[in-house]
Protein backbone atom coordinates (compact mmCIF):
# COMPACT_ATOMS: atom_id res chain seq x y z
CA UNK A 1 0.00 0.00 0.00
CA UNK A 2 1.60 3.24 -1.20
CA UNK A 3 -0.03 5.41 1.46
CA UNK A 4 1.31 3.18 4.24
CA UNK A 5 4.80 3.25 2.74
CA UNK A 6 4.71 7.08 2.63
CA UNK A 7 4.20 7.13 6.40
CA UNK A 8 7.27 4.95 7.01
CA UNK A 9 9.83 6.55 4.69
CA UNK A 10 11.41 9.98 4.41
CA UNK A 11 13.60 11.27 1.59
CA UNK A 12 15.80 14.33 1.10
CA UNK A 13 17.05 14.81 -2.44
CA UNK A 14 20.35 16.39 -3.35
CA UNK A 15 18.38 19.14 -5.05
CA UNK A 16 15.98 20.37 -2.44
CA UNK A 17 12.32 19.57 -2.64
CA UNK A 18 11.44 22.79 -0.84
CA UNK A 19 9.27 25.27 -2.69
CA UNK A 20 11.23 28.53 -2.99
CA UNK A 21 8.09 30.57 -3.66
CA UNK A 22 6.47 29.47 -0.38
CA UNK A 23 7.34 30.60 3.13
CA UNK A 24 8.92 28.26 5.65
CA UNK A 25 5.59 27.74 7.42
CA UNK A 26 3.77 27.20 4.10
CA UNK A 27 6.30 24.50 3.16
CA UNK A 28 5.80 22.82 6.53
CA UNK A 29 2.01 22.92 6.15
CA UNK A 30 2.25 21.59 2.60
CA UNK A 31 4.48 18.63 3.46
CA UNK A 32 2.63 17.90 6.68
CA UNK A 33 -0.53 17.57 4.59
CA UNK A 34 1.20 15.31 2.07
CA UNK A 35 2.34 13.08 4.93
CA UNK A 36 -1.25 12.90 6.19
CA UNK A 37 -0.73 14.75 9.46
CA UNK A 38 -3.69 16.49 11.09
CA UNK A 39 -3.75 20.29 11.42
CA UNK A 40 -3.02 19.94 15.13
CA UNK A 41 -0.07 17.60 14.50
CA UNK A 42 1.31 19.98 11.86
CA UNK A 43 1.02 22.96 14.20
CA UNK A 44 2.72 21.13 17.08
CA UNK A 45 5.50 19.71 14.89
CA UNK A 46 5.99 23.09 13.19
CA UNK A 47 6.44 24.91 16.49
CA UNK A 48 8.85 22.25 17.71
CA UNK A 49 10.86 22.31 14.48
CA UNK A 50 11.02 26.10 14.18
CA UNK A 51 12.26 26.27 17.76
CA UNK A 52 14.83 23.51 17.22
CA UNK A 53 16.19 25.16 14.06
CA UNK A 54 15.93 28.65 15.58
CA UNK A 55 13.72 29.79 12.70
CA UNK A 56 10.75 31.14 14.69
CA UNK A 57 11.42 34.69 13.46
CA UNK A 58 11.92 33.50 9.87
CA UNK A 59 8.77 31.37 9.46
CA UNK A 60 7.03 33.94 7.24
CA UNK A 61 10.05 34.42 4.97
CA UNK A 62 10.20 32.84 1.53
CA UNK A 63 12.44 29.78 1.39
CA UNK A 64 14.42 31.32 -1.49
CA UNK A 65 15.68 33.99 0.93
CA UNK A 66 17.35 31.43 3.21
CA UNK A 67 21.07 30.66 3.17
CA UNK A 68 21.99 27.24 1.74
CA UNK A 69 22.73 25.70 5.15
CA UNK A 70 19.33 26.68 6.53
CA UNK A 71 17.64 25.27 3.44
CA UNK A 72 19.44 21.96 3.94
CA UNK A 73 18.53 21.74 7.62
CA UNK A 74 14.92 22.65 6.83
CA UNK A 75 14.77 20.12 3.99
CA UNK A 76 16.08 17.37 6.27
CA UNK A 77 13.64 18.34 9.01
CA UNK A 78 10.77 18.18 6.52
CA UNK A 79 11.92 14.72 5.37
CA UNK A 80 11.44 13.46 8.95
CA UNK A 81 8.47 15.72 9.81
CA UNK A 82 6.16 12.69 9.94
CA UNK A 83 8.53 10.56 12.12
CA UNK A 84 9.34 7.90 9.52
CA UNK A 85 11.12 4.67 10.44
CA UNK A 86 13.67 5.18 7.63
CA UNK A 87 15.00 8.29 5.89
CA UNK A 88 17.20 8.43 2.79
CA UNK A 89 19.52 11.43 2.41
CA UNK A 90 21.16 12.04 -0.97
CA UNK A 91 24.35 14.12 -0.59
CA UNK A 92 22.78 16.13 2.25
CA UNK A 93 25.77 18.33 3.10
CA UNK A 94 27.08 19.23 -0.34
CA UNK A 95 28.16 22.83 -0.70
CA UNK A 96 27.94 23.98 2.91
CA UNK A 97 30.63 25.20 5.27
CA UNK A 98 32.21 22.88 7.90
CA UNK A 99 30.23 24.36 10.81
CA UNK A 100 26.90 23.86 9.03
CA UNK A 101 27.96 20.31 8.06
CA UNK A 102 28.62 19.53 11.72
CA UNK A 103 25.27 21.04 12.77
CA UNK A 104 23.56 18.98 10.09
CA UNK A 105 25.12 15.79 11.45
CA UNK A 106 23.86 16.71 14.92
CA UNK A 107 20.33 16.73 13.43
CA UNK A 108 21.01 13.31 11.89
CA UNK A 109 22.23 11.94 15.23
CA UNK A 110 19.13 13.32 16.98
CA UNK A 111 16.87 11.57 14.45
CA UNK A 112 18.78 8.31 14.87
CA UNK A 113 18.52 8.61 18.66
CA UNK A 114 14.74 8.91 18.28
CA UNK A 115 14.76 5.60 16.39
CA UNK A 116 14.92 6.65 12.73
CA UNK A 117 17.25 4.60 10.53
CA UNK A 118 19.25 7.02 8.38
CA UNK A 119 20.81 6.11 5.03
CA UNK A 120 23.26 8.73 3.73
CA UNK A 121 24.98 8.90 0.35
CA UNK A 122 28.10 11.04 0.45
CA UNK A 123 31.37 11.66 -1.34
CA UNK A 124 32.86 13.04 1.88
CA UNK A 125 34.75 10.16 3.46
CA UNK A 126 35.17 12.11 6.70
CA UNK A 127 31.37 11.95 6.99
CA UNK A 128 31.52 8.18 6.63
CA UNK A 129 33.38 8.22 9.97
CA UNK A 130 30.16 9.49 11.61
CA UNK A 131 28.16 6.44 10.49
CA UNK A 132 27.53 3.17 12.31
CA UNK A 133 28.05 1.17 9.11
CA UNK A 134 29.55 2.13 5.79
CA UNK A 135 29.02 0.67 2.33
CA UNK A 136 31.62 1.71 -0.23
CA UNK A 137 30.74 1.35 -3.88
CA UNK A 138 33.26 1.54 -6.71
CA UNK A 139 32.13 1.44 -10.33
CA UNK A 140 28.59 0.64 -9.21
CA UNK A 141 29.56 -2.42 -7.16
CA UNK A 142 29.71 -2.85 -3.39
CA UNK A 143 33.39 -3.27 -2.54
CA UNK A 144 33.22 -2.98 1.27
CA UNK A 145 30.60 -3.02 4.03
CA UNK A 146 31.37 -2.71 7.74
CA UNK A 147 31.89 -0.22 10.55
CA UNK A 148 34.36 2.59 9.86
CA UNK A 149 36.74 1.15 12.46
CA UNK A 150 36.63 -2.33 10.96
CA UNK A 151 37.15 -0.98 7.45
CA UNK A 152 40.18 1.05 8.57
CA UNK A 153 41.56 -2.04 10.29
CA UNK A 154 40.89 -4.35 7.33
CA UNK A 155 42.62 -1.98 4.90
CA UNK A 156 45.35 -0.93 7.35
CA UNK A 157 44.26 2.67 6.89
CA UNK A 158 44.19 5.65 9.23
CA UNK A 159 41.17 7.26 7.54
CA UNK A 160 38.15 6.42 5.42
CA UNK A 161 39.77 8.45 2.62
CA UNK A 162 42.60 5.92 2.59
CA UNK A 163 40.14 3.00 2.59
CA UNK A 164 38.31 4.46 -0.40
CA UNK A 165 41.55 5.26 -2.22
CA UNK A 166 42.76 1.67 -1.79
CA UNK A 167 39.47 0.24 -3.05
CA UNK A 168 39.24 2.63 -6.00
CA UNK A 169 42.87 2.10 -6.99
CA UNK A 170 42.46 -1.68 -6.96
CA UNK A 171 39.14 -1.71 -8.84
CA UNK A 172 39.03 -3.52 -12.14
CA UNK A 173 37.76 -0.89 -14.54
CA UNK A 174 35.59 -2.13 -17.36
CA UNK A 175 36.95 -0.97 -20.68
CA UNK A 176 34.89 1.18 -22.98
CA UNK A 177 34.25 -0.51 -26.30
Predicted segments with their positions:
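Catalytic Walker B motif of ABC-type/P-loop ATPase nucleotide-binding domains
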Residues: 87-91
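Helical segment within the ABC ATPase nucleotide-binding domain
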Residues: 102-114
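Conserved ABC ATPase signature
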Residues: 62-69
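ABC ATPase "signature
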Residues: 145-146
Amino acid sequence: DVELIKTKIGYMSQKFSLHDDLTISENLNFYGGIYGLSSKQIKNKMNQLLNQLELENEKNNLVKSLPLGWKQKLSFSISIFHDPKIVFLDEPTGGVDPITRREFWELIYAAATRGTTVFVTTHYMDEAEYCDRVCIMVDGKIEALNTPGQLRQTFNASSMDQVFYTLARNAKRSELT
